């Protein structure tokens, strides 16, 4: 495998907690620059496509991110404890939107800067064709 993209749903004591957040390896002086770029692209694509609250990108030293020998990103795609996020997550069309956003983020990671389209405009048929 060339990269690891781990999808999670979060939970919180408050039903008001909601939104998306992405994580890459980073601790002190050490970090994954490719993981950080992928996390940033994923976060921007998902927020642009879903309109969900932007929980931003964060460096973490979690084992999943630290011990993986390839760029690794963990994306929290919402909170099951949030009625708003939960309603979105049970909708197959919303899950398709998440999948498309993540696929576009991976595609954009490998595009030369001159060919990189603006966030939120590249669509799945253009990638698959």
Tell what function each PLM region has.
Residues 1-129:
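Active-site-proximal helix/loop segments of hydrolytic enzymes
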């Amino acid at each position: 495998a060339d990269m690891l993209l781990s999808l999670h749903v979060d939970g919180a004591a408050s039903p008001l907690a909601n939104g998306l957040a992405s994580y890459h390896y980073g601790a002190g002086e050490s970090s994954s620059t490719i993981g950080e770029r992928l996390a940033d692209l994923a976060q921007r694509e998902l927020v642009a496509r879903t309109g969900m609250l932007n929980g931003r990108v964060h460096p973490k030293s979690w084992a999943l991110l630290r011990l993986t020998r390839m760029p690794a990103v963990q994306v929290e795609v919402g909170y099951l404890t949030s009625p708003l996020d939960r309603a979105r997550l049970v909708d197959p069309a919303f899950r398709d939107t998440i999948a498309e956003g993540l696929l576009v983020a991976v595609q954009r990671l490998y595009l030369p800067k001159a060919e990189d389209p603006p966030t939120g405009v590249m669509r799945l048929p253009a990638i698959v064709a």
